């Protein structure tokens, strides 16, 4: 396929060849090398080319005299396009001019190019226009050209000539800015006649008369915008905004900022973030920021609204006309098409074998070289460098860090979002470096025991192929190297108990390179790998690095794809290359062309559902964007956010709702903002209380799970609508889990104390906590903190009177208020007093109120007997009578008394070792021999 074919394939309306502007035969266009040359015409010879500069051998005085002599006898003639403009302002052709000069004195006229006149210090062009539209009309013949005559000409200065269109002088008018930018494109005007006429008639906005947004009025005025979609979006020519740069600021009338950006990019325009000298138009909405307004006024950038944008789309020609800006954009597009052709040719060379029709695209177009990987080139090169030098670093015992510090690590950790090429890069680099690959991913069970079994004998210097090599098929020892790839290590579940810790131990002892891959680098379970792995972080590639690869795949499959559609696919999938290829393969089954409008529908229908984390859910709720009057988030979208994690989402919102500055108080005066803030917090707290009632019905005896949407509304959506705004602190994890666990623990301690004291007191748990615990705290731990040894018997006597044990003593210390008072008191008790109390308590017997049978636990190895059915019970009655005695004996054996804390079981005597037995036997024989001798 030729270059014209591929332009028609990707560009659509850009396939037509643009006519080139050819100069007239009477005035040939000078070459590029004649920029600073003069054409000198004499009577007897043709035009000769001489340098504009005087040779260095001549003095400054001679140079000035020669220029004055020539200026005395020659009129100034400026070469403008293909005509000669004299000092009287009349434009003639070169032939007509020389016919008029034949009757005059035969002198040597000189022709000064328009390039030289614009850059000369002697020629001055006072350009002062009234508006931006007149400045863009560069093809008008009425533009005055001022020339210097003998009377007004200044003597030539010996200094070097400087351009009058420098940046320091280009701020006077907008026209000078556009003129200086157009001079870079071989003398062509920046915009063609048709484009200039359309830009001249575009309705502009007077920025000087526009007010600056007052503080605290952004969200109030946002509600006055029109209904989205009330104005129809026009359809224009293909790439009609090519070569035009926009900046969007403020709140637009009917379009959101994202919709306006997509619309401009759809027609070939460029959208930047901040206004500058290179900005052509400002798409201005209501309540623009004061800094951007000052920049617009400073650079005098023309501003338009939505009507102006729609006017440009409907009136500009296809491909932006024939101006310099449009040609520059077209050249950039041709370079991208050339790059696509090179990628397609490289893919054809790598895939010489015909692929199967049933092969999926992700496998069919898997990268075969490092050039095929989109983005993260530096990270992939570091991975390849580490794998190349692994065995060299192993010989040095990993003590030489090298320039990047790679020589100190036996393993690397690749982290980054899914679908950006981490696993592909690992396999490709291993293949290029001649390694065999052993991969363990999330589908494999990677517990501590199984890792030991699977990797036993593998983490040495042998290759995996070496285990299967035979004499008939010997293994190439040059490739007898193995690399272990552990994919998705952050996905090790509870079934992979101890897997990360065992992997860390394997890395320390391994003799082969290990590549670990994860998505969430900040996961707590990956902390053991911080000191044993080198961190290589992959980032999401941008659309520029992915465009050529995606379009080359579409070109090979016969799918027409525009660059704007590629940008939307990259943005919608968050640079997930795998998902983009799968979307294209599915779309190709029904259609053969994808437009930007179709790509938006495909992304929305095939949107990948990503389960959000509790931190992200809380941030979305408490951020003010979801509850803005101009937000397009529906109530279903807000409820769906809750169901990403319905167990923690409302707890996170309740933990962080006090740390925001609500948007609703921005409209209030400073004196009333604090009161309004308290009222909003009170409303949010009441909503949380109502959600607790709903939650008790969901998790109560009846379990009304149909109330989950109501709970989402009352616990997340409604409270966040009151306090949503800007947050000044980081999102904190909920403390409810820890507090709830501690509360249950304290309740259990209080219940045990009440059970033990029921023989002496009749108080319930509430009375016991309010009246008895403070007195017992003063009589037991506080008295022990005095350090006197005579108080120990009194403390033990009081404990025995109320049937309190040693664990109850610690519980009383923990139940006291404030929460850390008991812990601080125990630190002040002398060690001698603690030891005396422990010895005294353990050496004496204490009364026990009662204990449950559940305190005596059966042995672990005993199995429970199955209960027979009713039919089997009648038949097995005789057998049960016979086995009754045996079962009773078995139950007695099953009881493990060592588990009972109230029964002290004597310890079994330790077996003597062989050496001690021999020593004792030898000592006994020696004693017997001494007795005999005696």
UniProtKB/Swiss-Prot annotation:
Residues 118-128 have a biased composition (Basic and acidic residues). One of its GO terms (biological process) is DNA strand elongation involved in mitotic DNA replication. InterPro entries: AAA+_ATPase (IPR003593), ATPase_AAA_core (IPR003959), BRCT_dom (IPR001357), BRCT_dom_sf (IPR036420), DNA_pol3_clamp-load_cplx_C (IPR008921), DNA_replication_fac_RFC1_C (IPR013725), P-loop_NTPase (IPR027417), RFC1 (IPR012178). The modification Phosphoserine is found at residue 27. Keywords: ATP-binding, Cell cycle, Cell division, DNA replication, DNA-binding, Nucleotide-binding, Nucleus, Phosphoprotein. Transmembrane segments: none annotated. GO terms for cellular component: chromatin; nuclear DNA replication factor C complex; nucleolus; nucleus. It holds the Pfam family AAA_lid_RFC1. It is found in: Nucleus, Nucleolus. Signal peptide: none annotated. GO terms for molecular function: ATP binding; ATP hydrolysis activity; chromatin binding; DNA binding; DNA clamp loader activity. Residues 1-190, 876-934 are annotated as: Disordered. Residues 236-326 form the BRCT domain. Residues 89-104 have a biased composition (Polar residues). Residues 876-895 have a biased composition (Acidic residues). ATP binds at residues 362, 374, 416-423, 519. Heteropentamer of subunits rfc1, rfc2, rfc3, rfc4 and rfc5 that forms a complex (RFC) with PCNA in the presence of ATP. Interacts with cdc24. The elongation of primed DNA templates by DNA polymerase delta and epsilon requires the action of the accessory proteins PCNA and activator 1. Subunit 1 is essential for cell cycle progression. It may associate with components of the DNA replication machinery and serve to enhance the efficiency of DNA replication. Belongs to the activator 1 large subunit family. This is Replication factor C subunit 1. It comes from Schizosaccharomyces pombe (strain 972 / ATCC 24843). The lineage of its organism: Eukaryota, Fungi, Dikarya, Ascomycota, Taphrinomycotina. The gene is rfc1.
């Amino acid at each position: 396929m030729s270059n014209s074919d591929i332009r028609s394939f990707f560009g659509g309306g850009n396939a037509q060849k643009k006519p080139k502007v050819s100069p007239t035969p009477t005035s040939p266009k000078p070459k590029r090398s004649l920029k600073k040359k003069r054409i000198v015409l004499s009577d007897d010879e043709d035009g000769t080319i001489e340098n504009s500069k005087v040779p260095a051998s001549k003095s400054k005085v001679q140079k000035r005299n020669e220029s004055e002599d020539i200026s005395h006898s020659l009129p100034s003639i400026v070469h403008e396009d293909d005509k000669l403009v004299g000092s009287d302002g009349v434009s003639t052709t070169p032939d007509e001019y020389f016919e008029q000069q034949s009757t005059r004195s035969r002198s040597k006229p000189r022709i000064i190019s328009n390039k030289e006149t614009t850059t000369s210090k002697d020629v001055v062009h006072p350009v002062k226009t009234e508006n931006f539209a007149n400045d863009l009309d560069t093809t008008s013949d009425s533009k005055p050209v001022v020339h210097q005559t003998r009377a007004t000409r200044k003597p030539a200065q010996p200094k070097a000539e400087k351009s009058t269109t420098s940046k320091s002088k280009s701020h006077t008018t907008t026209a000078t800015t556009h003129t200086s930018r157009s001079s870079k494109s071989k003398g062509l005007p920046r915009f063609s006649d048709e484009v200039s006429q359309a830009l001249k008639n575009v309705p502009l906005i007077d920025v000087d008369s526009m007010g600056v947004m007052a503080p605290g009025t952004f969200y109030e005025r946002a509600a006055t915008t029109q209904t989205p979609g009330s104005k129809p979006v026009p359809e224009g020519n293909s790439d009609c905004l090519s070569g035009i740069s926009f900046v969007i600021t403020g709140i637009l009338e009917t379009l959101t900022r994202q919709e306006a950006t997509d619309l401009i990019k759809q027609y070939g325009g460029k959208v930047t973030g901040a206004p500058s000298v290179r900005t052509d138009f400002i798409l201005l909405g209501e309540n623009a920021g004061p800094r951007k307004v000052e920049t617009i006024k400073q650079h005098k950038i023309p501003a338009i609204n939505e009507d102006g944008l729609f006017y440009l789309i409907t009136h500009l020609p296809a491909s932006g006309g024939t101006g310099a800006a449009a040609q520059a954009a077209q050249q950039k597009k041709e370079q991208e098409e050339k790059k696509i052709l090179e990628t397609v040719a490289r893919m054809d060379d790598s895939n010489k074998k015909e692929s199967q029709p049933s092969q999926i695209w992700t496998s069919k177009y898997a990268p075969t070289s490092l050039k095929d990987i989109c983005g993260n080139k530096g990270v992939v090169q570091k991975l390849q460098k580490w794998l190349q030098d692994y065995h060299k670093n192993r010989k040095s015992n990993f003590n030489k860090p090298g320039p990047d510090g790679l020589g100190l690590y036996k393993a690397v950790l690749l982290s980054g979002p899914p679908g950006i090429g981490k696993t592909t890069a690992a396999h490709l680099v291993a293949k290029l470096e001649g390694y065999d690959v052993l991969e363990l991913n999330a589908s494999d069970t990677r517990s501590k025991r199984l890792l030991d079994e699977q990797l036993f004998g593998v983490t040495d210097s042998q290759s995996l192929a070496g285990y299967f090599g035979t004499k008939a098929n010997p293994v190439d020892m040059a490739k007898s190297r193995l690399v272990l790839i552990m994919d998705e290590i952050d996905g090790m579940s509870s079934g992979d108990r101890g897997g990360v810790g065992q992997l860390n131990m394997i890395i320390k002892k391994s003799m082969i390179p290990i590549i670990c891959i994860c998505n969430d680098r900040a996961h707590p379970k990956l902390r053991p790998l911080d000191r044993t792995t080198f961190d290589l972080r992959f980032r999401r590639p941008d659309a520029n690095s992915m465009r050529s690869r995606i379009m080359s795949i579409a070109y090979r499959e016969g799918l027409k794809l525009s660059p704007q559609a590629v940008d939307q696919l990259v943005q919608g999938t968050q640079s997930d290359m795998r998902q983009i290829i799968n979307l294209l393969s599915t779309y190709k089954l029904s259609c053969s062309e994808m437009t930007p409008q179709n790509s938006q529908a495909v992304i929305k229908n095939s949107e990948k559902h990503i389960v959000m984390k509790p931190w992200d859910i809380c941030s979305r709720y408490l951020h003010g964007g979801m509850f803005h009057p101009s937000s397009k988030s529906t109530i279903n979208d807000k409820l769906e956010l809750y169901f990403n994690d319905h167990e923690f989402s409302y707890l996170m919102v309740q933990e962080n709702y006090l740390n925001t500055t609500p948007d609703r108080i921005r409209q209030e005066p400073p004196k009333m903002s604090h009161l309004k803030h308290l009222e909003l917090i009170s409303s949010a707290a009441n909503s949380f209380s109502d959600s607790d009632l709903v939650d008790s019905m969901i998790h109560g005896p009846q379990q009304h799970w149909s109330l989950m949407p109501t709970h989402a509304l009352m616990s997340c959506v409604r409270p966040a609508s009151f306090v949503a705004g800007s947050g000044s602190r980081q999102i904190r994890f909920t403390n409810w889990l820890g507090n709830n666990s501690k509360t249950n623990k304290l309740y259990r301690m209080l219940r045990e104390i009440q059970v033990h004291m029921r023989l002496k007191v009749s108080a319930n748990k509430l009375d016991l906590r309010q009246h008895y615990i403070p007195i017992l705290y003063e009589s037991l731990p506080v008295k022990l903190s005095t350090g006197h040894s005579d108080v120990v018997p009194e403390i033990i006597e009081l404990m025995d009177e109320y049937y309190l044990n040693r664990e109850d003593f610690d519980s009383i210390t923990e139940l006291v208020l404030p929460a850390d008072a008991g812990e601080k008191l125990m630190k002040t008790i002398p060690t001698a007093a603690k030891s005396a109390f422990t010895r005294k308590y353990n050496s004496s017997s204490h009364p026990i109120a009662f204990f449950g049978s559940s305190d005596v636990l059966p042995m672990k190895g005993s199995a429970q007997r199955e209960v027979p059915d009713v039919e089997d019970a009648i038949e097995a009655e005789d057998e049960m009578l016979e086995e009754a005695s045996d079962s009773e004996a078995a139950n007695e054996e099953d009881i493990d008394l060592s588990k009972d804390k109230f029964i002290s079981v004597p310890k079994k005597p330790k077996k003597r070792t062989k050496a001690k037995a021999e020593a004792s036997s030898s000592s006994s024989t020696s004693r017997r021999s001494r007795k005999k001798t005696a």
